[in-house]
Regions:
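Interfaces and regulatory segments of ATP-dependent nucleotide/adenylate/phosphodiester-chemistry enzymes
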Residues: 1
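Conserved PLP-enzyme active-site core in the AAT-like
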Residues: 4-27, 31, 38, 48-54, ...
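Aromatic- and Gly/Pro-rich donor/ligand-binding loops
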Residues: 64
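Flexible linker/loop signature enriched in Pro/Ser/Thr and Pro/Gly
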Residues: 85-88
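Conserved C-terminal alpha-helix-loop-beta "cap" of PLP-dependent enzymes
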Residues: 312-435
């Protein structure tokens, strides 16, 4: 497609000439960076293919299984594929795990008992986990079962306070939870290497403590996963990275055999464990999504870096910045006002293939302590590997952008978000012209 054809198509989708030119100039400056993402995607794609071949995935794995799900070949083989790809002893990969929060709650409840203590050495957890833990009172929380919680605040640079972590470890500490991604914060997302250093520090002092990593938004961003650097469990959602945009539901937990067995008994029933839980016809999408995931994540990473560079040049604080290494697919942009957050999200929604005509508004979403706006014209409801953006309507008024099943769609979404902010009067068109 030549430049004239490109501009014409973007114009049909509501992008002004100035915004299109700004996008083209930004993309041109990122060619070397994008090549690095392509190389990581190639490595991870081969890793997934090897795991599938090693575990003899066959057409029979896609068969519809109902009822109890005894001897569900597709389900059992897929769990072996995940364990192979993530280099763990075992995995639990199920449509009955409804989301990332459910997977995390399951892993915690399965491996903690009354009197145990849960420690977060990375500060406050993601908002929805506050009710799981009992930071905000909720029915069925860990706190109701006599499980205590403490957290160690991060240093000013967003990294680990090792002396405070050492002081927080005590005889009650049973499990340490490490959130890889920033969530609704402006701290850094952590590299696998940094997570490995933290785990090694904890294990040197308490080898018996379980180290669990919330791996949401991080799968296939790097060539290794937290399970390669000492994590006892990694946990994630199939409507994020590993589902590749095709999985319609599901979550996974991968790690040590005993811990995964505990999770299986908690998910189903003591005595039943992994033996039940029919796959109900979703296996082909689970396999195919996992196969495509490295390439899809690559497109999302390109979109995140593109967004960082687009908004950083306009003077907005972005985390990570346009040049930093990437450790998840989330791009935070601090817009400084509710109007900015809303206009950004409306632009993302307008770029969607589904529900592009819908105008998102902030609302009191369950599990959050403030109104939240979410833009996601997705094929799978709530899928954040698809083009999406969200943010709480509270200071510092940051928006969190992620996903895009293809780089082209991620690019369109960012340009539409900028166009939306210009149309709403949040960003001046004169400022865009200055950057051309």
């Amino acid at each position: 497609m030549n430049q004239t054809e490109s501009q014409s198509m973007y114009q049909k989708l509501g992008i002004s000439e100035e915004v299109w030119k700004y996008g083209q100039k930004t993309e041109e400056s990122l060619k070397e960076r994008f090549r690095g993402f392509d190389e990581t995607a190639e490595y991870n794609q081969l890793k997934v293919i090897h795991a599938m071949q090693e575990n003899r995935v066959s057409e029979g794995c896609f068969n519809y299984v109902s009822g109890y799900g005894y001897n569900d070949q597709g389900r059992d083989t897929l769990e072996q594929v995940y364990a192979s790809a993530f280099h763990t002893e075992a995995a639990l990969v199920r449509p009955q795990i409804t989301c990332g929060t459910h997977a995390l709650a399951l892993a915690l409840a399965a491996n903690l008992r009354p009197g145990d203590e849960l420690l977060s050495p990375v500060g406050k957890p993601y908002d929805t986990l506050e009710e799981v833990i009992g930071i905000r009172p909720s029915k069925g929380s860990l706190a109701e079962y006599g499980i205590t919680y403490r957290q160690v605040e991060l240093l000013e640079d967003g990294y680990f306070d090792y002396p405070a972590i050492e002081a927080a470890l005590n005889e009650k500490t049973k499990l340490v939870t490490i959130q890889r991604s920033k969530g609704y914060q402006t701290r850094p997302s952590y590299s696998v290497e940094k997570i490995g250093e933290l785990i090694a520090f904890i294990k040197e002092r308490r080898p018996d403590v379980i180290c669990m990593v919330d791996n949401c938004y991080g799968e296939f961003v790097e060539r290794i996963e937290p399970s390669d650097v000492g994590a006892d469990m990694i946990v994630g959602s199939l409507i994020k990275n590993p589902g590749g945009g095709l999985a319609p539901i599901g979550g996974y937990i991968a790690g040590k055999e005993e811990l995964i067995e505990n999770c299986a008994y908690r998910l189903t029933s003591p005595g039943l464990g992994k033996e039940v839980g029919a796959s109900l016809g979703v296996m082909q999408s689970f396999y195919q999504g996992f196969f495509l995931a490295p390439t899809v994540v690559c497109g999302a990473l390109k979109g995140a870096v593109f967004a960082a560079n687009i908004y950083e040049k306009l003077g907005y604080p972005v985390v990570p910045d346009g040049k930093e290494s990437r450790h998840d697919i989330i791009q935070a942009v601090t817009l400084g006002s509710p109007e900015g957050v809303v206009a950004f999200c409306k632009g993302i929604q307008a770029a969607a293939p589904v529900d592009s005509y819908v105008s998102p508004e902030p609302w009191a979403m369950p599990g959050y302590d403030s109104d939240v706006i979410m833009a996601a014209g997705a094929f799978v409801q709530g899928s954040s590997i698809e083009l999406s953006a969200d943010g709480p309507i509270k200071p510092p008024y940051a928006v969190y952008f992620q996903g895009g099943l293809t780089w082209t769609h991620a690019k369109l979404g960012i340009l539409k978000s900028l166009q939306g902010m210009i149309d709403a009067g949040v960003v001046s068109m004169d400022r865009i012209r200055e950057l051309l």
